[in-house]
Amino acid sequence: MSIIKALALAAAAGLLLTAPLGQPEARAKTKPAYSPRDFTGVYEGEFLTKLDFPYNERYGALFRKRQQDDIDNKPYDDPASHCLTSGMPAMMLSAGYPFEIFQSGRQITFTKENGSVRRIQMKRGHEGLDDGPLYMGDAIGHWDGDVLVVDTVNLRGDTSLERRIAPHSTAMHIKERIWRPSYGVILDEVTLTDPEAFTKPWVHTVKLTRHDEWELKEFVCDNNRYFLKPDGTSAIRGLAPVPR
């Protein structure tokens, strides 16, 4: 028997002795490969912990009134209470419902489980727009390296900056820089400028967490909407009264 053949047989015998019968070979754990320009998938946003918008005197007074009305459970006639979309920037600045991102060379689409849909156009500019104002505004995007830069204008003034109480005007302008620093995270740096409501721009970075095991479920707004009780306060169908 040659030396090479003997060494090969010895090595094979060693493998058989060290690998328990019926046990799969151990494999090193590796992080999933990803492209920083590929945003497709299901993500969960996050709630704002501080509503520190730089309001001027007029809009600051309106904001404080809405805050107190919300604390007192007084009805507020916002679009969401009529099963309408929360619009921008609330879609990106609030949590509660996950959203799925679909992507092509022409358009990037954010679809939220509550029915809100945001489309970022990648092949045109704002010129020639004859619609509006719009709940989601007119969003135009382009790539700056691996960062998606989005410019949004032409927004309605009856939506909120977050869930339902923070006002803004139709002059609001949204700029975003969106990037994917790791497989499971997208970061969205949002800059809001509103010369009618703010004294200066407001900047905040939102973290979006990826969930590969999630899928969006059917949502019917009428099953979850607010309604007015006989005493004029608001409630949500199906929820037990909150003790006070």
Predicted features, each with a name:
Residues 8-19:
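Bacterial N-terminal signal peptides
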Residues 3, 19-244:
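PEST-like low-complexity, intrinsically disordered acidic/proline/serine-rich tracts
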Residues 2-3, 8:
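Intrinsically disordered, low-complexity terminal tails
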